[in-house]
Amino acid sequence: MRISISNIAWDINEDEKIRDLLQEFHIGAIDIVPGKYFPKPEETTDNEIYKVKDWWSKNGIEIVGMQALLFKKNEMNIFGTKKSRSMMLEYLKRICHIGNILGAKRIVFGSPKNRDRTGLNDLETENIAIDFFNCLGDIANEENVVICLEPCPAYYGCNFMNTSFETAKIVTKILHPSIKMQLDSGAICVNAEDVFEILSKYSNLIGHIHLSEPNLVPLGDGNTNHNNIFNALAKYLPNSLVSVEMLATQNEPHLTSIRRALLVANKIYNSESLP
């Protein structure tokens, strides 16, 4: 399997050191948080986007995905007003454009605060979501990217698409070629889900895979059963791209925690790449 890691784990002023670490591990892919490089996406020029892409590319590293799309955009809510939905679609249109130029085809939609269905019944929730994500799917299709809906457990305060099964149900009903789901090992652990059951039923819906722990601690520091995740992926989605997702550590240098996480990822998911 091919390993990637999200830059949610480090600060962009550490990019050169991270580049060296990734080269040491023979890792040639990263996911990014777009806001780290482009704090105002609507004002970002194509040249600025190409500059980021080219820097990583010349170092042998491909940007393959994006996450945390709506960080600090709490005024936007799928289940808010029509104006709120319209604002969100316009903003995400720009995010998809950035993804297209970067080559980051896998756009992960997590954003639990931006999918708050409070006050709506199941039917209302479903109808609004299907309509919204079909519109977003059309935007993604125009930009040659895929939106991957992320399960977010109730444990994190989310109240829509909490489980992998709920997410798969929504993706199935949306029925748009540019809307997939994300497989998330941390969510599987929190929800005590059976990854073999998920993949036996829904492997065709998976657009991206995050390797994570509950609370996004460094890989291996939580209780996710990564051997089980690997075995299921090897059976149903061999040769997958799998991306390490962990928060930047507060009590340990980022390079130290990232090195530990990559050792775990490579040992289980890609032993041939160990330095």
Model-identified regions with their sequence ranges:
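Short, solvent-exposed loop/turn segments at secondary-structure boundaries
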Residues: 41-45, 77-83, 119-124, 158-162, ...
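Short phosphate-binding/catalytic loops that engage adenosine nucleotides
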Residues: 27, 61, 145
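Active-site acidic/histidine proton-transfer and metal-coordination neighborhood
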Residues: 16, 58, 75-180, 190
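Active-site-proximal loop/turn and secondary-structure-junction residues that shape catalytic pockets
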Residues: 9-11, 34-36, 69-72, 113-115, ...
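Histidine-acidic metal/acid-base catalytic patches
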Residues: 1-4, 11-26, 57, 89, ...
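Glycine-rich, aromatic-flanked loop segments that form ligand/cofactor-binding clefts
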Residues: 56-64
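Glycine-rich, proline-tolerant flexible connector loops at the mouths of alpha/beta enzymes
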Residues: 33-53, 113, 117
